[in-house]
Regions:
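Phosphate-binding loop that captures ATP/GTP phosphates
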Residues: 155-218, 224-225, 231
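C-terminal boundary of histidine-terminating zinc-finger modules
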Residues: 349-358
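Walker A/P-loop phosphate-binding motif and the immediately C-terminal alpha-helix
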Residues: 132-169, 189, 284
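A short, charged, Gly/Pro-tolerant segment at domain boundaries
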Residues: 371, 382-395
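Extreme N-terminal, non-catalytic leader segments
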Residues: 58-61, 68, 78-79, 85-134, ...
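N-proximal, solvent-exposed amphipathic alpha-helical segments enriched in charged/polar residues
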Residues: 14, 18-63, 95, 99-100
């Protein structure tokens, strides 16, 4: 620092020389404080989040790092519901710092930053609904509706605003599963319907509008029209996710829905057995055909838990969902159990994540929900709102 004094004195000002020394000293002090903070930021950004499948740096999740007392604090924003994730992430990041040689306590402020993601070409997201997620299967009987309702309820429990649309016109299940059988939605203006509420989510189904025992003897065009009306003429309000419980199969109805409804991502539900996997592959290829990204595979009835002794058995085989996910380069989002309690809870109108959120059988649903939302968070975001609307007028 000594060379700064002669330079200043040569200009005839001792005061300027002293001020120069003070400024240099202050800058050195700032740099000394910022260097450890930057070191902490680099370590945090290098953390590979197990749900996102990418580093916090790649996800641009680390918003701020600062010194706080004898340690550090960090503000982190993730693109999926973070309820219940704070303690797990805090412990993981503390370990990350220790590995990087930073021996100081860390406190994190964690929040969700759920954005709207891109949908099929020529379609736009629906109003205040950020993301429509379709839950589909190639065949019936694999537990798709149970997966869909627990997915929606798990997201709500983790802090998201969620709705569910029962798109199975021929066999609606959600009224029973949500404990809403016999209830009817209101219509204040006679044009739009208000969804029913259950366990913190909004719900709409053709089952709310017809008698439970009335068969829907409709042809395909009538079904797609009815579903389009249920989707577009319901006052959903602001939602982070709208889960669409799709009808089983891959026929004209499913294809038309996939083309008309702006879907941000699809979840394919299957069981481990080969016959279910064969149809699940058809469902996956259908979404690929209409440019809907498949977020991943959910293997339902992955294992059976005996209600008497707790013995675990793979009744329908093992590893089918994992093999299919690897074959098509998508994620395995979850392996869910076949448990008698799940059936009882769902039939009783209180699905597992609501009826027994702390039970071991509920944990796979919460994990599946977080993996699904994280898979969507890594997809391209919707940019349509940033472009101005162009109107051409003849003069």
């Amino acid at each position: 620092l000594s060379p700064a004094i002669p330079a200043a004195v040569s200009r005839g000002s001792v005061a300027e020389a002293l001020q120069s020394l003070i400024n240099i000293s202050a800058q050195v002090s700032v740099n000394n404080r910022e260097e450890p903070v930057n070191r902490v930021r680099i370590a945090l950004e290098a953390y590979l989040d197990p749900y996102l499948g990418e580093t916090l740096g790649a996800a641009q999740a680390v918003e701020e790092v600062r010194a706080a007392g004898t340690g550090y604090s960090a503000r982190i924003a993730l693109g999926f519901p973070v309820g219940g994730y704070q303690a797990e992430l805090q412990a993981a990041l503390a370990g990350q710092l220790a590995t990087a040689g930073v021996a100081a306590p860390l406190a994190i402020e964690l929040r969700s930053d759920i954005r709207s993601h891109a949908v099929q070409r020529n379609l736009k997201p629906l109003g205040e609904i950020s993301n429509v997620v379709a839950v589909a299967s190639g065949k019936g009987g694999v537990g798709k509706s149970t997966v869909a309702v627990n997915l929606a309820l798990a997201w709500a429990a983790q802090g998201a605003r969620v709705g569910i649309l029962d798109a199975d016109i021929y066999g609606p299940s959600q009224p029973l599963m949500l404990g809403l059988s016999g209830q009817r939605p209101s219509s204040p203006d006679g044009k739009r319907l208000r969804p029913l509420a259950s366990h913190g989510i909004s719900a709409m189904s053709i089952g709310f509008l017809v008698d439970a025992e009335q068969p829907m003897v409709w042809r395909g065009p009538m079904v797609t029209q009815a579903l389009t009306q249920l989707l577009g003429e319901t006052e959903w309000g602001a939602l982070d996710y709208l889960v669409v419980d799709m009808p089983p199969g891959t026929g004209d109805i499913q294809l038309t829905l996939a083309q008309r409804v702006p879907v941000a991502g699809a979840v394919i539900v299957t069981t481990p057995q080969d016959i279910a996997l064969a149809d699940a592959r058809k469902g996956l290829k259908m979404f690929e055909k209409v440019s809907v990204p498949v977020l991943g595979i959910v293997e339902n009835m992955s294992l059976h838990v005996c209600s008497n002794c707790g013995h675990i058995e793979h009744i329908f085989g093992a590893g089918g969902g994992e093999r299919m996910a690897r074959e098509y380069g998508v994620r395995l989002l979850g392996e869910l159990p076949l448990d008698g309690h799940i059936r009882e809870e769902t039939d009783g109108g209180r699905p597992t994540v609501v009826a027994a959120p702390e039970a071991p059988r509920a944990r796979p649903y919460f994990e599946m929900a977080r993996r699904t939302a994280a898979a969507l968070a890594t997809r391209a975001r919707d940019r349509s709102s940033v472009f101005p609307k162009i109107v051409v007028e003849e003069t």
